[in-house]
Curated annotation (Swiss-Prot):
Lineage start: Bacteria, Bacillati, Cyanobacteriota, Cyanophyceae, Thermostichales
Xref: HAMAP family: CH60 (MF_00600)
GO CC annotations, alphabetized: cytoplasm
Gene designation: groEL1
Subunit structure: Forms a cylinder of 14 subunits composed of two heptameric rings stacked back-to-back. Interacts with the co-chaperonin GroES.
Role: Together with its co-chaperonin GroES, plays an essential role in assisting protein folding. The GroEL-GroES system forms a nano-cage that allows encapsulation of the non-native substrate proteins and provides a physical environment optimized to promote and accelerate protein folding.
Catalytic reactions of this protein: ATP + H2O + a folded polypeptide = ADP + phosphate + an unfolded polypeptide
Name of protein: Chaperonin GroEL 1
Homology family: Belongs to the chaperonin (HSP60) family.
InterPro entries attached to this UniProt entry: Chaperonin_Cpn60_CS, Cpn60/GroEL, Cpn60/GroEL/TCP-1, GroEL-like_apical_dom_sf, GROEL-like_equatorial_sf, TCP-1-like_intermed_sf
Cross-referenced Pfam families: Cpn60_TCP1
EC number: 5.6.1.7
Gene3D superfamilies noted in UniProt: GroEL, GroEL-like equatorial domain, TCP-1-like chaperonin intermediate domain
Biological processes annotated in GO: protein refolding
Annotated segments matching region Disordered: 525-545
Length: 545
């Protein structure tokens, strides 16, 4: 494949063009008056979204170089999403503003390496300042505010997530399900989550989100390594006859047995997923027993005289729903309260009896997993399209809330970044010189971009609003929904400090990379051959082969 090689200014300009396209399509969703974006889907109804990272993932451009620019800025959004679960639009807008400002300086002859050093030092200073200004989240009112803002100013969702956190604790598991009705409701049921994901990505049922969701599955729990597929065949046949999915939780599954499961899954013979058992050694056995109690099944263990090839359906556990990602497995069980309570009592007694603080800690963890249960939010909506949008918003809200509990909250709506700009300016003037100072000033000018965009989406003049906010105290910002200046904490317009910090760090990282780019190598597009006349006669020419 021949390559195109582009140097210097041309390379950076082409990247910038791709970034402009992506940043604009994501920025329209920012703030309470942000608009929606409609995504065309190959199959099914179009999807209406208000979520930065989902939009960013959809954008592919024809020009390979511009597409590289899109991919770079998309990384800022998805890294922020991985770290904090929200703030993707802010990260995109910040990265774009920093790149724009930085390219101007590079074109004027500034040294990109010195600029990058300045950008990194400024970011480090801002991260410390954000931590200083963050307030811890104590009560459920603050949790509700964070969740409501993140779900697109939906107070009902905010209250629901605050309730869920009250019921399952701050470390508890909150899972989302699609409801059969139009209302969104909360339910707390028995369940647990452990830190092991699927053994093979081929088990994923939703390839876009890379997760396996199995409804009403059987659960096979065993402490042995499954090496031969023959051991599994009898139980697989029984499950296939019952017509339900199967989740296997085992110490490990060797290649041959795993390949058989994957092939059956892909051919649609049996909806199956396999997960490695959590923990190690004796602790692993104890956790497998917890899972068996939760799902009303048995651990098929050789030391209990049970063999895998002799297993019967009634030895398997049952769950309402199991969701498996690459790192976690969440089991939602039901109707087995008595056995779970008895098991919890047993663990409590062990905690009282043990002297080792390490064992105590591990037992506490097991108890929390079992006793905490799982809060299930059933997302309801009138149409499929609205349901998907609500589900994405709720997911953002849950992530934002967990981030807020971790690192505290700061004034939202782009306010924190705008108020930190003068502080950064003063610090940089004292501590930095030359081109490093210019690098810090690039960051300082970019800090007002999110607020400016929020104001513009609300139909106001962004530059004027930014200047007015700068004159006010730290906690006071612009409420775009009501078009007034308010104390952001009192008005409940708050962002998790972790989200603001991650957005800033990832934006600065991408900006530094783009500014220090001197050359781009991309594939040369192949010239399209014209079909000779008469080809495909009698066939529709529009088929994809």
């Amino acid at each position: 494949m021949a390559k195109r090689i582009i140097y210097n200014e041309n390379a950076r300009r082409a990247l910038e063009k791709g970034m402009d396209i992506l940043a604009e399509s994501v920025a329209v969703t920012l703030g309470p008056k942000g608009r929606n974006v409609v995504l065309e889907k190959k199959f099914g109804a179009p999807q209406i979204v208000n979520d930065g990272v989902t939009i960013a993932k959809e954008i592919e451009l024809e020009d390979h170089i511009e597409n590289t620019g899109v991919a770079l800025i998309r990384q800022a959004a998805s890294k922020t999403n991985d770290a904090a679960g929200d703030g993707t639009t802010t990260a995109t807008v910040l990265a774009h503003a920093m790149v724009k400002e930085g390219l101007r300086n590079v074109a004027a002859g500034a040294n990109p390496i010195a600029l990058k050093r300045g950008i990194d030092k400024a970011t480090q200073f801002l991260v410390e300042k954000i931590a200083e200004h963050a307030r811890p989240v104590e009560d459920s009112k603050a949790i509700a505010q964070v969740a409501a803002i993140s779900a697109g100013n939906d107070e009902e969702v905010g209250r629901m997530i605050a309730d869920a956190m009250d019921k399952v604790g701050k470390e508890g598991v909150i899972s989302l399900e699609e409801a059969k009705s139009m209302t969104t409701e909360l339910e707390v049921t028995e369940g647990m989550r452990f830190d092991k994901g699927y053994i093979s990505p081929y088990f994923a049922t939703d390839t876009e989100r890379m997760e396996a969701v199995l409804d009403e599955p059987f659960v096979l729990v065993t402490d042995k390594k499954i090496t031969l597929v023959q051991d599994l065949v009898p139980i697989l046949e029984q499950v296939a006859r019952a017509g339900k999915p199967l989740v296997i939780i085992a110490e490990d599954i060797e290649k041959e047995a795993l390949a058989t499961l994957v092939v059956n899954r892909l051919r649609g013979v049996l909806n199956v997923a396999a997960v490695k058992a959590p923990g190690f050694g004796d602790r692993s056995k104890a956790m497998l027993e917890d899972i068996a109690v939760l799902t009303a099944g048995q651990v098929i263990a050789e030391d209990a005289g049970l063999k895998l090839e002799n297993a019967k359906l009634d030895m398997l556990g049952k769950a309402r729903r199991i969701t498996i990602t690459k790192d976690h497995t969440t089991i939602v069980a039901e109707g087995n309260e008595k056995a779970v309570k008895a098991r919890c009592e047993q663990i409590r007694r062990q905690i009282e009896e043990t002297d080792s603080s390490y064992d105590k800690e591990k037992l506490q963890e097991r108890l929390a997993k079992l006793a905490g249960g799982v809060a299930v939010i059933k997302v309801g909506a009138a149409t499929e399209t609205e349901m998907k949008d609500r589900k994405l918003r709720l997911e953002d809200a849950i992530n934002a809330t967990k981030a807020a509990v971790e690192e505290g909250i700061v004034p939202g709506g782009g306010t924190t970044l705008v108020h930190l700009a003068p502080e950064l300016s003063n610090w940089a003037a004292e501590h930095l010189t030359g081109e490093e100072l210019i690098g810090a000033n690039i960051v300082e000018r970019a800090l007002s971009a999110p607020l400016r965009r929020i104001a513009e989406n609300a139909g106001q003049n962004g530059a004027i609003i930014v200047e007015r906010v700068k004159e006010k105290p730290f906690d006071v910002g612009y409420d775009a929904a009501k078009d007034e200046y308010v104390n952001m904490f009192d008005a409940g317009i708050v962002d998790p400090a972790k989200v603001t910090r991650s957005a800033l760090q990832n934006a600065a990282s991408i900006a530094g990379m783009v500014l220090t780019t001197e050359c781009i190598i991309v594939d040369k597009p192949e010239p399209k051959e014209n079909n000779p006349a008469g080809s495909g006669a009698g066939m529709g020419g529009d088929f994809d082969y």
